[in-house]
Amino acid sequence: MAKKLKKNEEITKKFGDERRKALDDALKNIEKDFGKGAVMRLGERAEQKVQVMSSGSLALDIALGAGGYPKGRIIEIYGPESSGKTTVALHAVAQAQKEGGIAAFIDAEHALDPAYAAALGVNIDELLLSQPDSGEQGLEIAGKLIDSGAVDLVVVDSVAALVPRAEIDGDIGDSHVGLQARMMSQAMRKLSASINKTKTIAIFINQLREKVGVMFGNPETTPGGRALKFYASVRLDVRGTTQIKGTGDQKDSSIGKETKIKVVKNKVAPPFKVAEVEIMYGEGISRTGELVKIASDLDIIQKAGAWFSYNGEKIGQGSENAKRYLAEHPELFDEIDRKVRVKFGLLEESEEESAMAVASEETDDLALDLDNGIEIED
């Protein structure tokens, strides 16, 4: 009996060795035909963290969980009109450029304001801009830029404005049922693999529509079919809430609005977190404002009455003075920003030094914008 068992073990071992050899040969052939990394063992990548790029907003980085937008993924930003969708996307463009990357903006709405983009920190001289004549043309341009592997971020503004060529060539009143949805579905199938391979971040801005005849539940939906919802790794719902009134001579006028950004879908971290930011007209997201609020909640910045202090030193009476002080002292802004990121696990102690240069450059630009006093109409 023991002799028979030993013989079975030898047969099994031999069969196992042959299987491993056959698998190795198959992997070599696949790698030869399709390139290195076409097939790999999951354990080889298990310890790799998801690569991210900061959104340009500390509060949004925290809500995203991973510390920013994941590279090689599709992001959808949607919301009502004038809620701040394009502003959020332009901050991502500015951040990509500050990190030394190349960004492209597909302006299907033909409504990009270069002066406002520059006020948000976008280098408009280096920004690649396309204003396509049709939806197919815009998506084809985005695809070629992504396939090049040389672009770090592509923004499409907006999906609702990607009009199929057949609809443009037809007459007003003609029925074109499902054309845009089919176009987007085909584009997602074609672009998703290339986006992941080149580690490009693709941001699609979308509008809201209402379903007709919905009695129960949320009647809101986004145009372009269901494909984008499925392929997107992150979906952000941007909603403006209350107006921000000015002080002094501007006490009766609105200088910005409080905005909530809800992460309604997230494949790289827990979803449903909310970032509350202040979008100031002509300035974009107030980075000093969100830092003062978050650091105060964590007691990194101490608040006693109306006074804000850091490490025992007063930095301003009232939030506006505290924000101004941080804008004028970029090294202090960087230090507090790093402490907040470490507290939320977005930055490890060993990564602090590498983050210092980028954060310092961002704050220098912020201080320069405040000194110039640029004001842009919304």
Curated annotation (Swiss-Prot):
Record flagged with keyword Metal-binding: no
Binding residues for ATP: G79, P80, E81, S82, S83, G84, K85, T86
GO CC list: cytosol
Disulfide bridge map: none
PROSITE patterns named among the record's database cross-references: RECA_1, RECA_2, RECA_3
InterPro entries, sorted: AAA+_ATPase, DNA_recomb/repair_RecA, DNA_recomb/repair_RecA_CS, P-loop_NTPase, RecA-like_C, RecA-like_N, RecA_ATP-bd, RecA_C_sf
Gene Ontology biological process terms, A to Z: DNA recombination; DNA repair; SOS response
Gene Ontology terms for molecular function: ATP binding; ATP hydrolysis activity; ATP-dependent DNA damage sensor activity; damaged DNA binding; single-stranded DNA binding
Subcellular location: Cytoplasm
Domain of life: Bacteria
Keyword set, alphabetical order: ATP-binding, Cytoplasm, DNA damage, DNA recombination, DNA repair, DNA-binding, Nucleotide-binding, SOS response
CDD domains xrefs: RecA
Function: Can catalyze the hydrolysis of ATP in the presence of single-stranded DNA, the ATP-dependent uptake of single-stranded DNA by duplex DNA, and the ATP-dependent hybridization of homologous single-stranded DNAs. It interacts with LexA causing its activation and leading to its autocatalytic cleavage.
Family listed: Belongs to the RecA family.
The protein, known as: Protein RecA
